[in-house]
C-alpha cells in the first residue's frame, strides 16, 4: 500500500512533512471531498470488509467509498503513515427515534495529538452531519464550521458530539415533509471514550451492521459526498444537494427523484463511482437523514 497513491486518490498535493493542524485539516477535507461515505456493496450483494488491504483496494485503486469502519480506518492508516500521533477510538451513535445511544460500538473515529493538544478527526459520518475540520477535545467548546456548529462535551470520561444546525429551505414542495430531512435544530450525533481500540474490536459489529434487518445500512442504500459548498446525497432513488448557508443561517436543500436507470450515470458523474455489480436501490423505513 502506497501513501502516494492515497494522496493521489484524494487530490492532495501539499506538504507531507508538516505534522500540524493545517495539514491535518487539509487531509480531512481532501478525503471527504474525494471519497464518498457509502454502503453500496451491501446492495450489490457484496460484503463490507475491514482488512486494510481490502479497503485500500476498494477505495484507492477502485475509486469507491465506504462506511465509517472503512474510510476512517484508511484515514487512520494514512495519518499514522505520515507520522501523526494517532489513536483509534470507538463511538456509539445516537438513535433519534429511540432517543438513546447505540448499545454496540458501531462507529470508528480517530484521535490525533499535535503539540500536546488532542483532536477528533472523522471522515466517516457523511451527509450534513460530517465535520469539515478536526475538533479539539475541549469540553463545552463550540466549533463553528461550514456545515454547522459542532460541540463536544465530556461527562464521567464519556465524550458527546452534538451539532447545532441551521434552518433549511426546500424549494420542491413535494419533499418538504421528507423523512430524509433532519427535524431537530440541536442534533446529538454520537458518544465515545478515549480508550484505544483496534480494528478487531469492530469485527462483530461490522458483520451485524451489514446483515441485521434492524440496521439502517441494510434498510437503505446511500452515497454521500462533500463539496466545497455543501453535500450530495443519494438515498435509494432520491438525490439531494444541500448548499450550506445559501442565505443567512439557512441551508438550501434540493431534492430530485431518479429513475432506477438514471442511478448508474449519477453515481459516475456526481460521486465518481463505477460499480462492478448491479445495485438494487433501497429506501427502507430505518431513520436516516441527509
UniProtKB/Swiss-Prot annotation:
Main location as per UniProt: cytoplasm
GO cellular component: cytoplasm
Binding site for CoA: 103-104, 208
GO MF annotation terms: arylamine N-acetyltransferase activity; N-hydroxyarylamine O-acetyltransferase activity
Pfam families: Acetyltransf_2
Active-site residue list: 68 (acyl-thioester intermediate), 107, 122
Function: Catalyzes the N- or O-acetylation of various arylamine and heterocyclic amine substrates, and participates in the detoxification of a plethora of hydrazine and arylamine drugs.
Record protein name field: Arylamine N-acetyltransferase 2
Organism: Mesocricetus auratus (Golden hamster)
Lineage, top ranks: Eukaryota, Metazoa, Chordata, Craniata, Vertebrata
Gene name of the encoded protein: NAT2
Amino acid at each position: 500500500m502506497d501513501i502516494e497513491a492515497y494522496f493521489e486518490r484524494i487530490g492532495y498535493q501539499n506538504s507531507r512533512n508538516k505534522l500540524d493542524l493545517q495539514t491535518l485539516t487539509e487531509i480531512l477535507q481532501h478525503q471527504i471531498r474525494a471519497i464518498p461515505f457509502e454502503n453500496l456493496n451491501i446492495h450489490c450483494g457484496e460484503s463490507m470488509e475491514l482488512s486494510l488491504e481490502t479497503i485500500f483496494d476498494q477505495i484507492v485503486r477502485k475509486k469507491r467509498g465506504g462506511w465509517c469502519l472503512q474510510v476512517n480506518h484508511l484515514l487512520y492508516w494514512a495519518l499514522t503513515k505520515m507520522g501523526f500521533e494517532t489513536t483509534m477510538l470507538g463511538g456509539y451513535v445516537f438513535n433519534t427515534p429511540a432517543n438513546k445511544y447505540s448499545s454496540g460500538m458501531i462507529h470508528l473515529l480517530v484521535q490525533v495529538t499535535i503539540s500536546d493538544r488532542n483532536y477528533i478527526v472523522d471522515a466517516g459520518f457523511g451527509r450534513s452531519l460530517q465535520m469539515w475540520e478536526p475538533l479539539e477535545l475541549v469540553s463545552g467548546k463550540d466549533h463553528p464550521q461550514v456545515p454547522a456548529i459542532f460541540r463536544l462535551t465530556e461527562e464521567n470520561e464519556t465524550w458527546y458530539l452534538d451539532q447545532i444546525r441551521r434552518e433549511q429551505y426546500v424549494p420542491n414542495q413535494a419533499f418538504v415533509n421528507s423523512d430524509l430531512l433532519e427535524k431537530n435544530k440541536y442534533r446529538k450525533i454520537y458518544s465515545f471514550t478515549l480508550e484505544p481500540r483496534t480494528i478487531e474490536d469492530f469485527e462483530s459489529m461490522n458483520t451485524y451492521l451489514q446483515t441485521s434487518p434492524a440496521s439502517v445500512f441494510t434498510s437503505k442504500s446511500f452515497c454521500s459526498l462533500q463539496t466545497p459548498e455543501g453535500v450530495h446525497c443519494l438515498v435509494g432513488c432520491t438525490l439531494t444537494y444541500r448548499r450550506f448557508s445559501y442565505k443567512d443561517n439557512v441551508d438550501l436543500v434540493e431534492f430530485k427523484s431518479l429513475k432506477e436507470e438514471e442511478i448508474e450515470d449519477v453515481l459516475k458523474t456526481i460521486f465518481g463511482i463505477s460499480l462492478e455489480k448491479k445495485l438494487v436501490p433501497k429506501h427502507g423505513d430505518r431513520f436516516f437523514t441527509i
